[in-house]
Design a protein with these regions (language model features):
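Active-site- or DNA-interface-adjacent structural scaffold in DNA-acting proteins
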Residues: 1-60
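Short, conserved catalytic/metal-binding motifs centered on acidic residues
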Residues: 7, 44-51, 80, 98, ...
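Short, well-ordered, mixed-charge alpha-helical segments that flank or form enzyme active sites
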Residues: 53-56, 78-84, 91-95, 119-123, ...
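Electropositive, glycine- and tryptophan-enriched low-complexity nucleic-acid-binding patches
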Residues: 62-109
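Domain-level cores of phosphate- or acyl-group-handling catalytic modules
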Residues: 89, 95, 99-143
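An anionic, glycine-rich sequence signature occurring as long contiguous blocks
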Residues: 140, 144-256
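A short, flexible helix-boundary coil/loop motif
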Residues: 162, 272-340
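Short amphipathic alpha-helical "interface-anchor" segments enriched in bulky aromatics
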Residues: 245, 249-283
Length: 340
């Protein structure tokens, strides 16, 4: 450039002028031309919020307090892409934002998932009105409902379901994660007529429980006097219970996939924004520029994720490899995406 390389402020100013909705549509449509969909067993849309902590400012002598950019993200497992990035108003939270987002969607044939904060009757109704289904958690924010489900899925009821209760189904699977052995047990039932506020939850057809048992060996201090080994191995077991409601009829395989894959938005989007792109290190307070940069990062993340099987490297190393000679490697990358 005749005037030299633009400064960071110039890039920030230019990026902030771009319409965020149009940018997201253009990048998503371009991504769809480059690659095929993933043909998942079930179609899911995972909703979750993420805060860009780098944009936060506390009140000081030279700064006034500024809240961070908080975005609601929607990850579509059919494409492996974050199809929506919506800024959350500072004066509210995710709950009304997710309702407004769902109202503009066609969810036919798609199961929606989110965390317990968004389990509200209005959001459930919005999903049903959009032609979709939901498998969502119940926690302390719906305290009475949560306690009712805890009482229903007691140890006796779980034993009955494992034994083959006609209204209920059971499924289990195990995996090894690092040094831990994890067992997942899934319980699902259509026995919901006992619940007194059934009519409040649009389209409700089943209740579910996920019991997660984590067993691992840890090193602890040897309490025996004059022991030769100061540290000894001890087996520790932890059990987690998660309760769910669903508009779907009983289908235990579908239930297990939906509850496990909800975390895709955290593992495949949020984690990489934090650690692969180091987005929290960006301290700009220009929220429009930061929002557009996040949309661009998600497009790049989707492209790199598709290319990962070829390069057999971490996404961070693939970024570094491509940046060494971007003009040479870009056509190669796009050719691979179109062929696979």
């Amino acid at each position: 450039m005749t005037g030299g390389i633009p400064k960071a402020n110039s890039y920030e100013r230019i990026i902030s002028l771009v319409n965020s909705d149009e940018l997201n549509k253009i990048l998503f449509n371009f991504f769809k031309t480059l690659t095929r969909n993933l043909n998942p067993e079930i179609k899911l849309r995972n909703f979750d919020g993420r805060v860009n902590n780098g944009s936060k400012r506390n009140t000081t002598v030279i700064n006034e307090k500024k809240s961070p950019l908080n975005c609601l993200n929607c990850y579509d497992n059919e494409y492996g892409y974050c199809i929506e990035t919506v800024p959350i108003d500072e004066k509210t939270n995710e709950i009304p934002t997710i309702e407004n987002l769902i109202n503009g969607m066609n969810l036919k044939g798609i199961i929606s998932t989110w965390d317990a904060l968004n389990t509200q009757t209005k959001n459930v109704k919005a999903v049903i009105n959009a032609g979709g289904d939901y498998i969502i958690p119940i926690k302390g924010n719906q305290e009475n409902f949560y306690n009712d489900l805890k009482l229903y899925f007691d140890s006796k009821k779980c034993e009955e379901i494992i034994a083959g209760n006609s209204n209920s189904v059971y499924y289990s699977e195990s995996e090894k994660s690092h040094s831990a052995f994890i067992k997942y047990e899934y319980f699902q039932t259509s026995d919901i007529s006992w619940y007194p506020n059934l009519s409040d939850w649009e389209g409700l057809h089943s209740f579910g429980l996920v019991k997660k048992t984590i067993t691992k060996k840890v090193k602890v201090k040897n309490e025996r006097k004059n022991a030769k080994k100061k540290m000894i191995e001890k087996t520790v077991t932890a059990i987690e219970y998660r309760y769910y409601i669903s508009s779907k009829q009983v289908n235990i395989k579908e239930f297990s996939i939906a509850t496990r894959q909800h975390w895709a938005v955290e593992n495949k989007i949020h984690w990489h924004l934090d650690f692969t792109f180091r987005q929290d290190n960006n301290t700009t307070t220009n929220k429009k520029a930061l929002l557009n940069l996040e949309i661009i990062h998600k497009f790049v993340l989707a492209v790199l994720s598709k290319a990962k099987p070829t390069y057999k490297k971490s996404l961070k190393l693939i970024r570094k490899h491509l940046s060494n000679n971007f003009e040479e490697f870009l056509p190669e990358l796009f050719c691979y995406l179109m062929l696979n």
